Regions:
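An acidic-aromatic
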Residues: 59-117, 172-183
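A short, amphipathic edge element
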Residues: 53-56, 118-130, 179
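Residues that act as N-cap/strand-start positions at coil-to-secondary-structure junctions
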Residues: 43, 52-54, 79-81, 126-127, ...
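Gly/Pro-enriched, hydrophobic low-complexity segments
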Residues: 73-85, 136-201
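Extended, positively charged loop/linker patches that create polyanion-binding surfaces
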Residues: 114-116, 125-131, 140-146
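N-terminal leader/targeting segments and the immediate start of mature chains
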Residues: 2, 9, 13-67, 188, ...
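Structural motif
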Residues: 51, 135-136
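Short, exposed beta-strand/loop patches in secreted or surface proteins that constitute
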Residues: 58-62, 85-87, 126-133, 158-159
Length: 209
């Protein structure tokens, strides 16, 4: 199974134009590209997203404002297939590693490229604390959150890790959509996970992110 780059943001990424909210399939991907506080915790985890009974998986590695996603199924880009994506918020760029071509395909980071780290959701209008809960075996606070993106209202349950502020689980109350960490581990991440691989040529994408 492969996923085109154009579809990736909808299937694997929580497209914050909010294609995510439009109900397209994939792993939620909303890494804040703005200046709001991004949790500085370093961690790795296994993400699973369920859409209408179908599941999608990815491994995630985070180090401050740098993220690495290793997909179970490759993403088809304009230059070939990529199983690894690196999100560099500090550069406002997304990199796709094309192993066969030894190329690093670079796209700009748009507001539609988000990752499940911080609690604030795009278009958030209301947030109510429900109480204490658990997710991924960790203590969390459970919130009811309502968003409104371009007139589309959606309600969510959101589990936020008490220690790190990272979103560990997000469930839509209005459609068959959920995301959660099956595994979440706080641990130092090697810097090279988020750098340009040696021997790769950098190439700018001709299409948008």
């Amino acid at each position: 199974m492969s996923i085109t780059l154009g579809e990736k943001a909808c299937r694997w990424g929580l497209c914050l134009g909010l294609v995510l909210w439009v109900g397209r399939e994939g792993i939620l991907c909303y890494a804040a590209a703005d200046d709001a506080a991004v949790p500085s915790a370093e961690f790795s985890g296994s993400l699973v997203k369920t859409v209408k009974g179908r599941q999608y998986h990815a491994q995630v590695f985070a180090k401050g404002d740098r993220l690495r996603l290793e997909y179970k199924y490759a993403i088809r880009t304009e230059r070939g297939y990529a199983a690894i994506e690196i999100i560099r918020l500090d550069k406002s760029e997304t990199w796709y590693l094309l192993a066969q071509q030894k190329e690093l395909l670079v796209t700009g980071l748009s507001q539609d490229d988000l990752f499940p780290i911080r609690p604030a959701l795009p278009g958030e209008r209301d947030r109510i604390l429900v109480g204490d809960a658990t997710a991924a075996g960790r203590a969390t606070q459970l919130f009811e959150v309502q968003t409104d993106r371009h007139g589309r209202v959606e309600r969510f349950y959101e589990w936020v890790d008490l220690d790190t502020g990272v979103v560990l689980k997000l469930v839509s109350r209005d459609r068959e959509w959920s995301f959660e960490y099956e595994r979440f581990r706080l641990s130092p991440q090697p810097a090279y996970y988020f750098e340009e691989p040696p021997g790769y040529n950098k190439r700018m994408a001709t299409t948008g992110p």
